[in-house]
Every structure is written in structure tokens, then in C-alpha cells.
């Protein structure tokens, strides 16, 4: 059986941990391995941080939207903003590429997402926003939604 959740919150950096913990609690019903849980929570942090820092340029009046679903041991996650958008998604997905070189850890967000998830798709349009679609097949699943 499929299970889903939706979450939206202000694009403020302190909400990144809220998003990470909430998604972690949602996938806990799948009984993921510690590595899977850590990877998913890290990906949430990276995508939400990208939305806040790059999408909304740190302006707290934006909203970050998360949709998560689980079905048959497959976890799907969508993180969306209505911010600045990305003019060249392929360039932005290159390791160490950043539009904010002054920030530490810059340029690894998409690389981390690609390494931790089975599928990553980025759809973006300048001045419209960005949506990141992520999918992970969990190795150990005792989910109530199986």
C-alpha cells in the first residue's frame, strides 16, 4: 500500500533540520538501514539548503515544498521551490560548480544527491523555480505499506 506525506515551510535555514527529521520519521516505517537513513536525511538537507540559499537567495519569504511517498520499498521524494531557478541544470550538476563560491561546502549538493539516491532528476526554469525528483530503492523493507 502506498503512503504519502506533504510538507511546506518558510525558506529559512533553521527549517532545514525540521525537514530532515520529518522525512526521516516518515521513512522510519520502512525500517531502513542506518546507511539508508543517513543518506536520505543528507539528501534532504542538501536539496532544502539549495532551495533556501540558491533558489530564494536567502530571502525567508519563500516556501519550500516537500512531497514524499513510499510504495513497495521504494522511497520517492520531491523538493520544490518557486525561486530563482537554474539557467543551466547540467552545468549546475557538475561537481564543485557553484554560484556562491564564498560559502563553504559549496558545489557538492547535486553530487551528493546523485551518489546517495538511485535516481535524480532536476527540472528548473529561471524565475519560476526548481524541482528535484529523487528515488531510492531500499534494501531492507518491512514497511506497513508493503
Swiss-Prot record:
SMART domains: HATPase_c (SM00387). GO terms for molecular function: ATP binding; protein serine kinase activity; protein serine/threonine kinase activity; sigma factor antagonist activity. Keywords: ATP-binding, Kinase, Nucleotide-binding, Serine/threonine-protein kinase, Sporulation, Transferase. The keyword DNA-binding does not apply. It catalyses: L-seryl-[protein] + ATP = O-phospho-L-seryl-[protein] + ADP + H(+); L-threonyl-[protein] + ATP = O-phospho-L-threonyl-[protein] + ADP + H(+). It comes from the Bacteria. It is an enzyme of class 2 (transferase). The keyword Kinase applies. Disulfide bonds: none annotated. Its EC number is 2.7.11.1. GO terms for biological process: asexual sporulation; negative regulation of sporulation resulting in formation of a cellular spore; sporulation resulting in formation of a cellular spore. Belongs to the anti-sigma-factor family. Binds to sigma F and blocks its ability to form an RNA polymerase holoenzyme (E-sigma F). Phosphorylates SpoIIAA on a serine residue. This phosphorylation may enable SpoIIAA to act as an anti-anti-sigma factor that counteracts SpoIIAB and thus releases sigma F from inhibition. This is Anti-sigma F factor. The gene is spoIIAB.
Amino acid at each position: 500500500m502506498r503512503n504519502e506525506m506533504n510538507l511546506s515551510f518558510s525558506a529559512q535555514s533553521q527549517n532545514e533540520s525540521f525537514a530532515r527529521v520529518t522525512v526521516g520519521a516518515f521513512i522510519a516505517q520502512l525500517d531502513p538501514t542506518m546507511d539508508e537513513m543517513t543518506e536520505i536525511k543528507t539528501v534532504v538537507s542538501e536539496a532544502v539548503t539549495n532551495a533556501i540559499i540558491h533558489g530564494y537567495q536567502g530571502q525567508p519569504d519563500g516556501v519550500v515544498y516537500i512531497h514524499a511517498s513510499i510504495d513497495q520499498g521504494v522511497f520517492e521524494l520531491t523538493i520544490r521551490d518557486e525561486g530563482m531557478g537554474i539557467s543551466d541544470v547540467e552545468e549546475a550538476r557538475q561537481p564543485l560548480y557553484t554560484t556562491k563560491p564564498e560559502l563553504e561546502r559549496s558545489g557538492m549538493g547535486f553530487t551528493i544527491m546523485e551518489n546517495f539516491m538511485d535516481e535524480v532528476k532536476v527540472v528548473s526554469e529561471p524565475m519560476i523555480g526548481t524541482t528535484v525528483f529523487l528515488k531510492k530503492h531500499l534494501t531492507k523493507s518491512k514497511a506497513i505499506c508493503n
